[in-house]
Amino acid sequence: MKLSIDFKNKVREAILSDRENYGGSDADYAKRLNLKGAILSRLKKGEVEKLISDTQWLVIAHQLGVQVRDNAWKVARTVVYTEIEDNLLYCKEYSKSMILVDDCGIGKTFCSRHIVRKLKNAFYVDCSQAKTKQQFIRLLAKTIGVDNTGKYVDVKASIKMCLIYLEQPLIVLDEAGDLDYNAFLELKELWNATQGECAWYMMGADGLRAKIESGIAHKKVGYAEIFDRFFDITSIVPQGTDDRREFYIQLLGDVASVNAKQKEDVDKLVRKCMNPNDLNTKDVTPSDWKRLRYLENLIKLS
């Protein structure tokens, strides 16, 4: 697959935009993208040809949310988007820490990625891609622009220094339930070292909820301290069945209204998500409800 000049220029524009939201040096920013400083300098001057491999272009595009093909999926300001945005802005402003534990498929990842890209010194980490403490620390280092190839203790020390040096940094830890026990303990150390200087926002679904409950119930060393530091555990989806149903109808409707090809299809799409098997209404249970990924597939196939 040969990448077009237009695509490379889109990635270049994304790099320049992302650079504006990073408070470190050009050299540090280049490390985030696994680029040499000289290559970044040439990109800033407008060059795109014969600088890096097509694979590197694609890796950077993925990191910065640039699509190879425009899928035309629009962002809806749902209650999930607004709640996460409010949480992130609060944490960032006051260097606080929070945990969001909620249903899967409500747009937590999509919303947080979109919001983080707009904020200065805000960083998104997908913990499902770095489950052990070694993988996690080195991925975090790369994400914030720190050399992640040295000795483990040196990399960790550099992370602490960088997070203290940056202005109001925010770290979003998505899929945090995938982190193993030792990686969780590293979070306690990082939080202690950056208290009052860095905001942390942990997100997850059933896996994170189970890890929190099991760790505290079995009195695993460090767990109570970790979740005490992430002082507020929040959820967005209501608990009562009727309230949950109304929440999902609203969420699906909000997303469908800005993405459906025909506006008159919105109600039909929502009904299909809430009752995908065409059951009698009284036989439909919350476990039958489909969520945003299903809605996206319906819209793209329509």
Which residues does each predicted region cover?
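C-terminal alpha-helical "lid" subdomain
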Residues: 1-66, 232-302
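Pre-Walker A adenine-sensing motif
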Residues: 75-93
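Walker A/P-loop nucleotide-binding motif
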Residues: 93-114, 128-129
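Sensor-1/coupling segment of RecA-like P-loop NTPase cores
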Residues: 97-104, 191-221
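Short, well-ordered alpha-helices that flank and scaffold nucleotide-derived cofactor binding pockets
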Residues: 117, 142, 189
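Conserved catalytic segments around the Walker B and adjacent sensor/switch elements
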Residues: 119-129
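Mid-core helix/loop region of P-loop NTP-binding domains shared across ATPases and GTPases
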Residues: 132-138, 147-199, 221-222, 226-227, ...
